[in-house]
Curated annotation (Swiss-Prot):
The UniProt record lists the keyword Membrane: no
Gene transcribed to yield this protein: petR
Functional summary from the UniProt entry: Necessary for photosynthetic and respiratory growth. Probable promoter-specific protein mediating the interaction between DNA and RNA polymerase.
Keyword list, A-Z: Activator, DNA-binding, Phosphoprotein, Transcription, Transcription regulation, Two-component regulatory system
Entry GO terms, CC: cytosol; protein-DNA complex
Protein name: Protein PetR
Domain named Response regulatory: residues: 8-121
DNA-binding region residue numbers: 77-95, 132-236
Length: 237
């Protein structure tokens, strides 16, 4: 019997260090985690992915977390937990009035965040948290639960290593992943061929092959982008 898919969390914080620490901590505790750097980035991720819960920093440059919360509440019922350096009662009330489900002042213990997330998820009706989780890549759609790529009702065949790469990139959509990290992740994925997954050059070859299947023009990648000097990033619609 297959186990249920882990809850998918969206972490939105403009502080790269905090964002990375929270992402690693929550992944270690059994969640699927996608990270956004600001409200605009979060909107792009929300347009192509389904989340069980959003952890949202209030104090961000540009559109702040309260404004984003108010807008999201007009479109979706996904639970929102706000993080902020301002812990006054008035600020907490403002956050809850905006539509947040909970409010956690900084600094906080990661364990408390974990407990609050689990408490919110226990309260949320199944109908709210359930649903298709997919990425849109132009005419293509990637199902996160099934790990399947399709165009309309036609499946797009992926090799074991291509499928492993898609799983890795989809779990970190919008985030740069370095070659070393990709090699390590592929090495842990038993479905990927050990020979295909080994080495920087082999990863580049597999990226090129995957682009041929997901890009309108593989020579000018729109979705699977190269971030010079850093690695690769999957940028869904």
């Amino acid at each position: 019997m297959m186990s249920a898919s882990p809850p998918h969390l969206l972490i939105v914080d403009d502080d790269e260090r905090i964002r990375g620490l929270l992402q690693k901590f929550l992944i270690r505790n059994g969640f699927l985690v996608t990270a956004g750097r600001d409200a605009a980035h979060a909107r792009r991720l929300l347009s192509g992915l389904e989340f069980n819960l959003i952890v949202l920093d209030v104090m961000m440059p540009g559109e702040d977390g309260l404004s984003l919360t108010r807008d999201l509440r007009t479109k979706m019922a996904t639970p929102i937990l706000l993080l902020t350096a301002r812990g006054e009662t008035r600020e907490r009330i403002e956050g809850l009035e905006a539509g947040a489900d909970d409010y956690l002042p900084k600094p906080f213990e990661p364990k408390e965040l974990l407990l609050r997330i689990n408490a919110i998820l226990r309260r949320v009706p199944e109908a709210v948290t359930a649903g298709p989780k997919y990425l849109s890549l132009g005419p293509l759609r990637y199902d996160l639960d099934r790990g399947e790529l399709s165009q309309g009702d036609q499946p797009v065949r992926l090799t074991a290593t291509e499928a492993a790469l898609m799983r890795i990139f989809a779990a970190h959509a919008g985030e740069v992943i370095g070659r070393t990290e990709l090699i390590e992740e592929l090495g842990r994925d038993r479905s990927a061929s050990a020979e295909e997954a080994a080495g920087d050059r082999a990863v580049d070859v597999q990226i090129t092959r995957l682009r041929r299947k997901i890009e309108p023009d593989p020579r000018e990648p729109r979705y699977l982008q190269t971030v010079r000097g850093l690695g690769y990033m999957l940028a869904p619609d």
